[in-house]
C-alpha cells in the first residue's frame, strides 16, 4: 500500500547553526533525517530535483524551507520536489 504526503521541511536551523561552507551538505542530511523521522523508515531516496534546489544558489545560500512530496512504498521512501 502506497502512502503519499506533502511536507514543508524547514532548513532555517541548518542555516543558523552551520558554518557557511557546510550548509548545503547539512541541509541534505537534515532533509533525510526529517523524512526518516516522519515517515518511520530507514531507507530514504531523494530525487535529484531536491539536490538541485538546495545547491541552486551555491554552498552557503540554501533555501529557508523546501516543499517535498513523499511516497512510501513498503520500506522505501521516495521524495521529490513540489513545484
UniProtKB/Swiss-Prot annotation:
One of its GO terms (cellular component) is cytosolic large ribosomal subunit. Keywords: Ribonucleoprotein, Ribosomal protein. InterPro entries: Ribosomal_eL31, Ribosomal_eL31_CS, Ribosomal_eL31_dom_sf. Transmembrane segments: none annotated. GO terms for biological process: cytoplasmic translation. GO terms for molecular function: structural constituent of ribosome. Belongs to the eukaryotic ribosomal protein eL31 family. PANTHER family: 60S RIBOSOMAL PROTEIN L31. This is Large ribosomal subunit protein eL31. It comes from Methanococcus maripaludis (strain C6 / ATCC BAA-1332).
Amino acid at each position: 500500500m502506497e502512502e503519499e504526503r506533502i511536507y514543508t521541511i524547514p532548513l532555517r536551523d541548518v542555516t543558523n547553526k552551520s558554518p557557511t561552507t557546510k550548509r548545503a551538505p547539512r541541509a541534505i542530511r537534515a532533509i533525510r533525517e526529517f523524512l526518516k523521522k516522519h515517515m518511520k523508515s530507514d531507507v530514504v531516496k531523494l530525487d535529484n530535483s531536491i539536490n538541485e534546489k538546495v545547491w541552486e544558489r551555491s554552498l552557503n545560500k540554501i533555501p529557508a524551507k523546501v516543499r517535498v512530496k513523499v511516497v512510501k512504498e513498503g520500506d522505501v521512501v521516495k521524495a521529490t520536489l513540489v513545484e
